């Protein structure tokens, strides 16, 4: 409340200046001496300040001194009790009540505790005596005197620490998931972020220093770029002229915070706007936990920025273990969950588990330097093996012949354990992948892949091409041994029927887990959208000549050699007995509705139009909406000879889904005119009725992309629309 009083006084102090600038009548005094009216002027200003102070809050304040309050803190309240019922109970048992606030969580549910204020100290003491241990809906209330708000503050801190909020350093995730772009934004005060996390922030912003010709329509037009504006007002003086002050109310609190970030300090008609939260939108009461600065060692004056996101320090020990993204979220919520979760998917505690741990390394801060080192070592080993291929291949044929009996033994206890492992592991796939989706939301460091991949150019891929050429020659000498291997695999697979039968049953249980993958994969799509920086183009261009040489090597490995591998022995009788029919119908059909829309949304946002390939390696060119994929890279992937299409032309048309069915093309055009000049708008119709989707064409790709950023997720008549670039335009 003290903050509200100061804000009201500040606004009142600026009002005379506004009136003078707008040409409001001012009382002059001759020869610089204060006249009789001039002597009354300070008294009038003081009265105006007092009036504004009384009017400052949206609740009745019974105390002249706002720091002196007679409050009681009540806990163990049944969760279904509303604040009005609690107020009636206290009024009946104690007497007059001036203020009741039931503490709520982010979803609007009661936390089981409340703050009750009284006008007199005797009422506060009586409440602690009478209501303590009073049974309400079978639960004994716990009532304590709390004049300084200390009990309420501790309760809030305890609740927020349980949910991962305060006490975890700046940026810790609170009761509402706040994007890092807001947490680390210097334009937004910390108290506003804390109130937003607690779900106790209003949706109204206060705008000052407006040009006097700005009306409410212009104000609404400007601030609509930050969100859905419910109401916009310009404050006027007694003559009906603008005072250069406005108030804008949004549909959601986060839109108001976004407006502060977007417009505070920006010029409107050559005047910088001052945008802040309206004092009535800030949370009431002083029991909200204040921000506590990080405790520093004695004698240390301060610290600079760490190397992690948002200036957070990183843990070097975690980096060496491959979990460097542990500090990605400002509260230490990181990517180690991915490596750990994937490692548990199939109960893979054996050799597979060791391999899957590398997923944690890849996710950890996109540690591309480590990948470079691994690839370099692998390529060197491949080159050495290929150089020995002339004599070594001949020696390896008897070894491959001896693989047949070994493969027979694979299908016994090993395959049965695999079935059991899959059964336990697949049940956890859904929850683990959900955690992957949440973490991918925070993968702001994916944008650094471009610069990291650029370092992969001179990795020694030339050695890889020459090695593959030698592998082609070696494969020609392996044929007879592989034939016998095929025979052994045929017998082995016949014994795999029973374990695979059990795999079919476990995959049926995957349905519910995969259904939870939808939102996660959609969030992964948003992150993947940032994975095509310009740095990737320059590095991949260097791979063009190398890929040409790899094509000739791959040709030598195909056709004749693979035909001699005896794989036909694996078909018919053995595969028919594998129980794969259990994997259809009930299980895989449930995977379709969950993965279909989600994968569609995620892959479309990746901006990749992947084709096949032609000539020696692939048939069609890779089309990428973003990135500089020209030159030799396009030539190698575009087939032998000629230049591939390379960069796809950016589209100027967007596709809008989930529109209200009463929305017309004119309404659609008017709505998207806020983003830029619309050339064409249309609603898709079927049998004369709207299909709930439409297209909008702009004059440039940049305007189309801006429309996607501004309008995607906006609510129209209660429906959240989906806006994306129309690839088919």
Swiss-Prot record:
Biased composition range(s): Low complexity: 1-13
Modified residues (N-acetylalanine): 2
Gene3D superfamilies: 3.30.70.330
Residue ranges, annotated region (27 X 6 AA repeats of [GEVSTPAN]-[ILMV]-[DE]-[RH]-[MLVI]-[GAV]): 399-607
Entry-linked InterPro entries: HnRNP_M_PY-NLS, hnRNPM_RRM3, Nucleotide-bd_a/b_plait_sf, RBD_domain_sf, RRM_dom, RRT5_SRSF_SR
CDD domains with a match to the protein in the record: RRM1_hnRNPM (cd12657), RRM2_hnRNPM (cd12659), RRM3_hnRNPM (cd12661)
Keyword terms of this UniProt record: Acetylation, Isopeptide bond, Methylation, mRNA processing, mRNA splicing, Nucleus, Phosphoprotein, Repeat, Ribonucleoprotein, RNA-binding, Spliceosome, Ubl conjugation
Location relative to the cell: Nucleus
GO molecular function: protein domain specific binding; RNA binding
Disulfide bonds: none
Positions bearing Phosphothreonine: 664
Sequence repeat locations: 399-404, 406-411, 414-419, 425-430, 432-437, 439-444, 445-450, 452-457, 460-465, 467-472, 474-479, 481-486, 492-497, 499-504, 506-511, 513-518, 520-525, 527-532, 539-544, 546-551, 553-558, 561-566, 567-571, 574-579, 580-584, 587-592, 602-607
Covalent link Glycyl lysine isopeptide (Lys-Gly) (interchain with G-Cter in SUMO1), residues: 697
Modified residues (Phosphoserine): 29, 85, 203, 364, 376, 396, 431, 451, 467, 480, 527, 574, 587, 617, 632, 636, 700
Modified sites of kind Omega-N-methylarginine: 495
Domain RRM: 70-148, 203-280, 652-728
Region (Disordered): 1-65
Biased composition (Basic and acidic residues): 37-49
Chief location: nucleus
UniProt cross-link Glycyl lysine isopeptide (Lys-Gly) (interchain with G-Cter in SUMO2), position: 17, 37, 68, 82, 87, 126, 133, 142, 144, 220, 276, 284, 344, 380, 387, 650, 666, 684, 691, 697, 715
Protein name stated in the entry: Heterogeneous nuclear ribonucleoprotein M
Organism, as annotated: Mus musculus
């Amino acid at each position: 409340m003290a903050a509200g009083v100061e804000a009201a006084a500040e606004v009142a102090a600026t009002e005379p200046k506004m009136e003078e600038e707008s040409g409001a009548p001012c009382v002059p005094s001759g020869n610089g001496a204060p006249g009789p009216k001039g002597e009354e002027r300070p008294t009038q200003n003081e009265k105006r300040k007092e009036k504004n102070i009384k009017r400052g809050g949206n609740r009745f304040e019974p105390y002249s001194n706002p720091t002196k309050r007679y409050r009681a803190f009540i806990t163990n309240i049944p969760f279904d009790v509303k604040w009005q019922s609690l107020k009636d109970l206290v009024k009946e048992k104690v007497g007059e009540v001036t203020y009741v606030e039931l503490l709520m969580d982010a979803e609007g549910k009661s936390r089981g505790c409340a703050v009750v204020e009284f006008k007199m100290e005797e009422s506060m003491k009586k409440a602690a005596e009478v209501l303590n241990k009073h049974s309400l809906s079978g639960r004994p209330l716990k009532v304590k005197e709390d004049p300084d708000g200390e009990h309420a503050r501790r309760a809030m801190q305890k609740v927020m620490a349980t949910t991962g909020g305060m006490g975890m350093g700046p940026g810790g995730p609170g009761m509402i998931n706040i994007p890092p772009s807001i947490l680390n934004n210097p334009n937004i005060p910390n108290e506003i972020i804390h109130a937003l996390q607690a779900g106790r922030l209003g949706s109204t912003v206060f705008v000052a220093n407006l040009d006097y010709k700005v009306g409410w329509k212009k104000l609404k037009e400007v601030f609509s770029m930050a969100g859905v504006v419910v109401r916009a007002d310009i404050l006027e003086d007694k003559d009906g002229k603008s005072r250069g002050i406005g108030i804008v109310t949004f549909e959601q609190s986060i839109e108001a915070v976004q407006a502060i970030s977007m417009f505070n300090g920006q010029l409107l008609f050559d005047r910088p706007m001052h945008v802040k939260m309206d004092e009535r939108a800030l949370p009431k009461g002083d029991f909200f936990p204040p921000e506590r600065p990080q405790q520093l060692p004695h004698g240390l004056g301060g610290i600079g920025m760490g190397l992690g996101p948002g200036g957070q320090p990183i843990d070097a020990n975690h980096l060496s273990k491959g979990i460097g993204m542990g500090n990605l979220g400002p509260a230490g919520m990181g990517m180690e969950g991915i490596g750990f979760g994937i490692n548990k998917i199939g109960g893979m505690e054996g050799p597979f588990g060791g391999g899957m741990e590398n997923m944690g390394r890849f996710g950890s801060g996109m540690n591309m330097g480590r990948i470079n080192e691994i690839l370099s070592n692998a390529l060197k080993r491949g080159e050495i093996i290929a150089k020995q291929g002339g004599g070594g291949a001949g020696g390896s044929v008897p070894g491959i012949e001896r693989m047949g009996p070994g493969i027979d033994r694979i299908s016994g206890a090993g395959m049965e354990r695999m079935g059991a492992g899959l059964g336990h592991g697949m049940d956890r796939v859904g929850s683990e992948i959900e955690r992957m989706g949440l973490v991918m939301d925070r993968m702001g460091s994916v944008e650094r892949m471009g610069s990291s991949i650029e370092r992969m150019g001179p990795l020694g891929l030339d050695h890889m091409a020459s090695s593959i050429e030698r592998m082609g020659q070696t494969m020609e000498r392996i044929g007879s041994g592989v034939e016998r291997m095929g025979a052994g695999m045929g017998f082995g697979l016949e014994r795999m029927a029973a374990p695979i039968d059990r795999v079919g049953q476990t995959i049926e249980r995957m349905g519910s887990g995969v259904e939870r993958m939808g939102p996660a994969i959609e969030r992964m799509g948003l992150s993947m959208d940032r994975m095509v920086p310009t740095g990737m183009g320059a590095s991949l261009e260097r791979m063009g000549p190398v890929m040409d040489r790899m094509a000739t090597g791959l040709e030598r490995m195909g056709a004749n050699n693979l035909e001699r591998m005896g794989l036909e022995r694996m078909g018919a009788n053995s595969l028919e007995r594998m129980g794969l029919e259990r994997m259809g119908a009930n299980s895989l059909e449930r995977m379709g509705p969950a993965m279909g829309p989600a994968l569609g949304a995620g892959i479309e946002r990746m901006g990749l139009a992947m084709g096949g390939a032609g000539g020696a390696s692939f048939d069609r060119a890779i089309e990428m909406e973003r990135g500089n994929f020209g030159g030799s890279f396009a030539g190698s992937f575009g087939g032998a000879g000629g230049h591939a299409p390379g960069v796809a032309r950016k589209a100027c048309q967007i596709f809008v889904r989930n529109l209200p069915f009463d929305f017309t093309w004119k309404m659609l055009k008017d709505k998207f005119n806020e983003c830029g000049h619309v050339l064409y708008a249309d609603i898709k119709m079927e049998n004369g009725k709207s299909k709930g989707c439409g297209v909008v064409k702009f004059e440039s790709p940049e305007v189309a992309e801006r429309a996607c950023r501004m309008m995607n997720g906006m609510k129209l008549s209660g429906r959240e629309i989906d806006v994306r670039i129309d690839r088919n335009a």
